[in-house]
Regions:
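Secondary-structure boundary/capping residues
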Residues: 35, 112, 141-142
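Second-shell loop/turn segments in exported
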Residues: 8-16, 87-90, 116-122, 143-147
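Surface-exposed, flexible loop/turn segments at secondary-structure boundaries
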Residues: 40-42, 122, 149
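Helix-loop-strand module that forms the ligand-binding subsite of alpha/beta enzymes
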Residues: 44-137
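Short, surface-exposed alpha-helical segments at coil->helix boundaries
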Residues: 16, 20, 24, 97, ...
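Glycine-rich phosphate/pyrophosphate-binding loop and the adjoining helix
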Residues: 140-164
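A SAM-dependent methyltransferase catalytic signature shared across enzymes that methylate proteins
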Residues: 29-31, 137-140
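N-terminal beta1-alpha1-beta2 submodule of the flavodoxin-like/Rossmannoid cofactor-binding fold
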Residues: 1-82, 94, 157-164
């Protein structure tokens, strides 16, 4: 989100549950590379059915020890070259999706401006962004932004411009 230049590199890390079209659109808005936060064991539609008490996310919600989701990788190519990082995630029970926590714990955000944003049809950003900042304990974390399901590309582009 935003423009890349020789003195500043921007990137976006995010856990997403949508398809490639949305990913290409996000890359266009960012103007920089994307890094997908991918659980080692992908979440299926059934896993994400929060109204089913036997679903994976419901069990993880009820038992915090299950929330330590292993990721395929936490190594972002050229991580040290980034000065601004956007972290996007869906909201689960008022918090960032569990895989995002694992990514944040595994990386050093020293010297980086971190701009969190979330997507949710109904839940607010809440304390999800400040909780991620506490997990990271490094970096200059900015106030987060929630985008609802009706947000369009122009809304996201306008927000990114405000961050620059």
């Amino acid at each position: 989100m935003g423009q890349a230049s020789s003195h500043m590199r921007r990137g976006r890390g995010g856990h997403h549950l949508d398809g490639g079209v949305r990913q290409r659109r996000k890359r266009h808005i960012i103007g920089g590379p994307l890094f997908e936060i991918e659980p080692a064991e992908s979440y299926t539609s059934d896993d994400l059915n929060y109204s089913d008490p036997d679903s994976r996310v419901s069990k993880e919600h009820d038992d915090e020890s299950l929330r330590d989701v292993k990721l395929k990788t936490t190594d972002v190519p050229d991580w040290s070259s980034y000065t601004t990082v956007y972290i996007g995630y869906p909201i689960w029970w008022g918090e960032a999706a569990w895989p995002v926590n694992a990514f944040v714990r595994a990386n050093d955000f020293s010297g980086k401006t971190v701009i969190p944003f979330c997507t949710s049809a109904s839940s607010p950003l809440g304390s999800s962004a400040s909780n991620l900042a506490k997990l990271a304990s490094t970096g200059d974390w900015k106030e987060g932004q929630r985008f609802n399901s009706s947000a369009n590309t122009q809304t996201a582009e306008d927000w990114v411009k405000q961050q620059s």
